Curated annotation (Swiss-Prot):
<dbReference type="InterPro" id="IPR022171">
    <property type="entry name" value="PPE_C"/>
</dbReference>
<dbReference type="Pfam" id="PF12484">
    <property type="entry name" value="PPE-SVP"/>
</dbReference>
<protein>
    <recommendedName>
        <fullName>Uncharacterized PPE family protein PPE30</fullName>
    </recommendedName>
</protein>
<comment type="similarity">
    <text>Belongs to the mycobacterial PPE family.</text>
</comment>
<dbReference type="InterPro" id="IPR000030">
    <property type="entry name" value="PPE_dom"/>
</dbReference>
<dbReference type="Pfam" id="PF00823">
    <property type="entry name" value="PPE"/>
</dbReference>
<dbReference type="InterPro" id="IPR038332">
    <property type="entry name" value="PPE_sf"/>
</dbReference>
<dbReference type="GO" id="GO:0052572">
    <property type="term" value="P:response to host immune response"/>
</dbReference>
Amino acid sequence: MDFGVLPPEINSGRMYAGPGSGPMLAAAAAWDGLATELQSTAADYGSVISVLTGVWSGQSSGTMAAAAAPYVAWMSATAALAREAAAQASAAAAAYEAAFAATVPPPVVAANRAELAVLAATNIFGQNTGAIAAAEARYAEMWAQDAAAMYGYAGSSSVATQVTPFAAPPPTTNAAGLATQGVAVAQAVGASAGNARSLVSEVLEFLATAGTNYNKTVASLMNAVTGVPYASSVYNSMLGLGFAESKMVLPANDTVISTIFGMVQFQKFFNPVTPFNPDLIPKSALGAGLGLRSAISSGLGSTAPAISAGASQAGSVGGMSVPPSWAAATPAIRTVAAVFSSTGLQAVPAAAISEGSLLSQMALASVAGGALGGAAARATGGFLGGGRVTAVKKSLKDSDLPDKLRRVVAHMMEKPESVQHWHTDEDGLDDLLAELKKKPGIHAVHMAGGNKAEIAPTISESG
């Protein structure tokens, strides 16, 4: 810009119209502070790198130092440039101050112009010509002074504004690192998913073949853990023994339970502490068993003619009718099945279990009475069927072989399941007896109802 063509009003007005040197001084202080901070940071970085490279050596340490060193150098260089910029700003502020001081103040220029106007207005006769020339001369000096100040300021400011350009910081990371990291992450995720699928497949395959490969897996594990090549063989042998013993647990348990139950019942039934005493049988209980006989007799007496044959004269052994001497030879205590097969309907409620034995004295009295009552019921069977009852046929005498008979009865008591039962009528009785004489064992013959009721020999033994 050609400041010489501009009047002092403009040049002086511009210099006085601006903010002054304050902003330039503030910029210089800011640049100076930035330079100080950059220099301190660079020193800290350099110290840290020196410490790391001293205690950490290797390729990674060298790579780190190589990546950080350019950045430290850049910070140091930038600090120097910032300090230079601060100095330039300070120089620019100084140039402004010098130009401002050299510039004619605008009020002085305005006063000169006002004086010139007055002189020119009062110069009627030419008397103000010298004063006017002097005022013009002072104005010209003002013009030259402002032009010189502006030219000097322009030169100084142009030098002060010439600052070395700043460089961008060097990269400390690989620009392709993000892309490479993304590719690596994708590959890792894919590999992890593949490994998970493979692991699931292996687990499922192992579970599917766990039953078949159990021995092989356990054998390998035993050999690997113990270090003994024959450990698996010992393990399999012990496992086989364990399985064999476990298979015998249930049968042995059932056998022991059955045996113990039988022993307990035997002890309760054949309790030697409280033997059976027929004298202790209550008369009321005996009457309860005989009640059925009296009821039947009373009922028959009102609706039927008198019975022409003797009844209830035979004894009872279990469910069989025998001679009276047989019943006397029978032991006092009998099996539960034999006792209850001869009881009547009224004897069952009277049989109560008492402390000390399976059947108390009262219960035995009840079933004994039922046996007698049962004889009455069997004696009237022929009459109720519409026929008549004749005299009982005695094929065996009371005095026939009492010892042998006792032995047969005792055998029946010990093994009631060995008795073979046969059912026939009067017409087939002789043939059945003839056939049974050829068969060994103990036989019980049961007579079916007919024209007459006959108690046949129900026990036979051969061999």
